Regions:
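N-terminal alpha-helical modules
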Residues: 9-107
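Bacterial N-terminal signal peptides
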Residues: 1-8
């Protein structure tokens, strides 16, 4: 008897930066969990944010966290509108990328 074992790949339910299995998902979170492109954008943005916060000094880190909280409110305002959510992630990634580029500039 032989068995075929498939590698375990992250599924949309487990890949987002939040638990897609929760029963109390907001409309924006549900759209992110249900849309692979948004799910991937969420993971990329959350990972970038985590790395960036680990590289910043405390005051700057706190400011970045405040910006992230404000951005999350904007994302929530999109509700389940995939186009709005896509634009929100693109804009936030641009901001985070610019912050990274600022770190690499010589003093």
């Amino acid at each position: 008897m032989s068995f075929l074992i498939a590698p375990t790949l992250p599924t949309p339910a487990s890949a987002a930066s939040f638990d897609c299995e929760r029963t109390d998902l907001a409309a924006d979170e549900k759209a992110i969990c249900d849309t692979r492109v948004l799910n991937d954008a969420d993971v990329k943005m959350a990972t970038t944010f985590d790395i960036l916060t680990s590289l910043l000094a405390m005051g700057t880190r706190d400011a970045l966290r405040d910006e992230q909280s404000a951005w999350l409110k904007k994302r929530q305002a999109c509700g389940g509108d995939v186009a709005c959510l896509t634009a929100a992630y693109e804009a936030r990634m641009k901001q985070l990328t610019q912050a990274f580029e600022g770190l690499s500039r010589p003093l």
